[in-house]
Amino acid sequence: MPELPEVETVRRGLTPAMEGVVIARADVNRPDLRWPFPADMAARLTGKRVERLRRRSKYILMDLDSGETLLVHLGMSGRMLVSGDPLGQFVHSHPAPEKHDHVVFHMANNARITFNDPRRFGAMDLMETASADTHKLLSVLGPEPLGNDFHESHLIEAFKNRNSPVKSVLLDQRIVSGLGNIYVCEALFRAKIHPIRKAGKISGARVATLVPIIREVLAEAIEAGGSSLRDFKQADGELGYFQHSFDVYGREGAPCKGEGCTGQIKRIVQSGRSSFYCAQCQR
């Protein structure tokens, strides 16, 4: 499932084609994805100007001039692909429609944005922009890891007296939003913290080091266009490249990249997810 860097990469790719542009027509080709689409979604999108594209956690939020916001979740295999984006006086051709093109935005600038989702775990919903923060999917989210509300004292307080493994705590979207399996594994390696270590047993000083490390990992991943492991593509159809920089994720049995370390990367399963780590480096 796309994590924060992948969703942010898609948002940045969509912005030039959508922000400030009218949706000339919206095609909704099925009644649902993971959940039913909101009533009259095509009509509520058609003719509306996209005032702003933003991201909250793993959701793309499209603020419209109608006072509504479209929430988009990519799910497991969802992609939002741009075609026909005007370049000077030329317009690139659009690809032929595909079977899993479920929602298509025809923009007034001749761009077309296609939401393609073979596994249909994605989702879309419409809400009032003024009350978007109270939406059931958004109201429970913790601070953004790249924002000012995510700081050392917040994380230290969240870890206090927690018997859960540190990895589980970092994956809790109520504590910090947008983190997923890949980037938690990578951050814990850089912090030299074992993924099964109980969060409440980690010193405040070590917990504090996680904040800049998490930000560093996410910033590097965004710069690389995210990680493409199975389904993820950027808005222009290109793959992400951060997977080539993984220190631990997906590297079971490979030599540890830690300086002077002779260990190998190991894999365990925690709450149904694979955790990758170096037993020599991470304590």
Curated annotation (Swiss-Prot):
Is DNA-binding among this UniProt entry's keywords? yes
Per the entry, the cofactor note is:
Binds 1 zinc ion per subunit.
| Catalysed reaction equations from the record | Hydrolysis of DNA containing ring-opened 7-methylguanine residues, releasing 2,6-diamino-4-hydroxy-5-(N-methyl)formamidopyrimidine; 2'-deoxyribonucleotide-(2'-deoxyribose 5'-phosphate)-2'-deoxyribonucleotide-DNA = a 3'-end 2'-deoxyribonucleotide-(2,3-dehydro-2,3-deoxyribose 5'-phosphate)-DNA + a 5'-end 5'-phospho-2'-deoxyribonucleoside-DNA + H(+)
Q: What Gene3D superfamilies does this protein's entry cite?
A: 1.10.8.50, MutM-like, N-terminal
* UniProt function note: Involved in base excision repair of DNA damaged by oxidation or by mutagenic agents. Acts as a DNA glycosylase that recognizes and removes damaged bases. Has a preference for oxidized purines, such as 7,8-dihydro-8-oxoguanine (8-oxoG). Has AP (apurinic/apyrimidinic) lyase activity and introduces nicks in the DNA strand. Cleaves the DNA backbone by beta-delta elimination to generate a single-strand break at the site of the removed base with both 3'- and 5'-phosphates.
Q: Name one GO molecular function term.
A: 8-oxo-7,8-dihydroguanine DNA N-glycosylase activity
Quick one: which gene encodes this? mutM
Q: Where does DNA bind?
A: 100, 119, 162
Which species does the entry assign this protein to? Roseobacter denitrificans (strain ATCC 33942 / OCh 114) (Erythrobacter sp. (strain OCh 114))
Cofactor dependence: Zn(2+)
Q: Does the keyword Cell cycle apply?
A: no
* Entry EC no(s): 3.2.2.23, 4.2.99.18
Please report the name of this protein according to its UniProt entry: Formamidopyrimidine-DNA glycosylase
